[in-house]
């Protein structure tokens, strides 16, 4: 349980550092960061992130229309894997923001 809490806190902090908002999950081991500021659908974000950085996230729309503007990220992975994935997400977000 503590390892899940540690990983959840790591993701939430990483999102904050990237300027992404995300509600803290209270149950499952998924986060839903808000990606709406990038002006693309959650499907487009997920597809490009997979193609460009080789990291899979689930488009929020897979969970209904209210999921648009969000992607689902699981933290049921090792902290090392999450660090690698979030490093790639940071690089991707910087490109989308025109900072890289």
Predicted regions and their residues:
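PLP-dependent class I/II
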Residues: 1-100
């Amino acid at each position: 349980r503590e390892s899940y809490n540690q990983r959840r806190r790591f993701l939430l902090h990483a999102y904050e550092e990237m300027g992404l908002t995300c509600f803290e999950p209270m149950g499952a081991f998924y986060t839903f960061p808000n990606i709406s500021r990038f002006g693309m659908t959650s499907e487009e974000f997920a597809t490009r992130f997979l193609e460009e950085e080789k990291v899979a996230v689930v488009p929020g729309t897979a969970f209904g229309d209210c999921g648009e503007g969000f992607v689902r990220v699981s933290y049921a992975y090792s902290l090392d894997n999450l660090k690698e994935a979030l490093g790639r997400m940071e690089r991707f977000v910087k490109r989308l923001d025109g900072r890289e």
